[in-house]
């Protein structure tokens, strides 16, 4: 069967190309993990259960934080009903996950969202970059479901 080996090779080449082209899902950054830990610390201090890190929420939050920095913007995304989102930013010289959570806890609306008992998962995004005339900012996004 003369045509078989080349057909098999072509099929194998296509499958390999698809595997190589598939985007790898990046693991959460150290800052994104620290933000989840600080959120869960705050929830524990108020007698609430820890939230698990949601992969889909994390991918969306990371992409949104990157978008906000690149677009020089600061606004909420359109999310599915039942999903909450909080944003924060600060200059690179001082802004860390603990400061983001402290800011959220000091704002009644953000505090209510962060401490909502019904949420079970959180995803975080953390992006560093030049933004709105600042040479270096850290942009934090937390999404809850």
Please identify what each model-predicted range represents.
Residues 10-19:
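Bacterial N-terminal signal peptides
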Residues 21-23:
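N-terminal signal peptide c-region/cleavage motif recognized by signal peptidases
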Residues 25-30, 44-53, 85-101:
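Second-shell loop/turn segments in exported
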Residues 27-70:
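A short alpha-helix/helix-coil micro-patch that ends at or immediately precedes a cysteine
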Residues 45-59, 72-80, 111-127:
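Surface-exposed patches in mature extracellular/periplasmic domains of secreted proteins
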